[in-house]
Every structure is written in C-alpha cells, then in structure tokens.
Amino acid sequence: MLKFLLKFRKRRRPVVVPRFVRFIVYVVLFTVAVQRVKQERDAHLRRYEERLRKNRARRRQSFP
C-alpha cells in the first residue's frame, strides 16, 4: 500500500481541471461572496436604524 502511494506521488502531473468546472467553481465562490456582503450590509443598516430609533426616543423624553 505504501509503495503504491509513493509511486503515485512520484508521478506528479499537473492536475487538469476542465474550463467549465473552473467556471462553475468561480461562479459559486462569487455568489457566496456577494451573499456575505449583502448580509453584512443589511446587518449594518439594521444597527444604524436601531441607533436612530433609540436616539429619537431619547430626544423625545428629554424635551417633553
């Protein structure tokens, strides 16, 4: 078994990935990145709106 693995390591040919497979991988990675950016932006907006709401409530209490 070990001999087989060593023999396999010696025959190190560059791995050829078909172009369309590479394209699909890039599309998936790009989609994941876009989704992550959207989530971060939504979370930031949510925090910002929450802060605004709290500030408005505080202002109303201090000026009756």
From Swiss-Prot:
Domain of life of the organism encoding this protein: Viruses
Chief place where the protein resides: host cell
Residues in the signal sequence: none
Annotated Gene Ontology cellular component terms: host cell membrane; membrane
Membrane topology annotation: Single-pass membrane protein
Keyword terms: Host membrane, Membrane, Transmembrane, Transmembrane helix
Subcellular location: Host membrane
TM ranges: 15-37
InterPro entries per record: HHV-5_US34A
Family, per entry: Belongs to the HHV-5 US34A protein family.
Designated name of the protein: Uncharacterized protein US34A
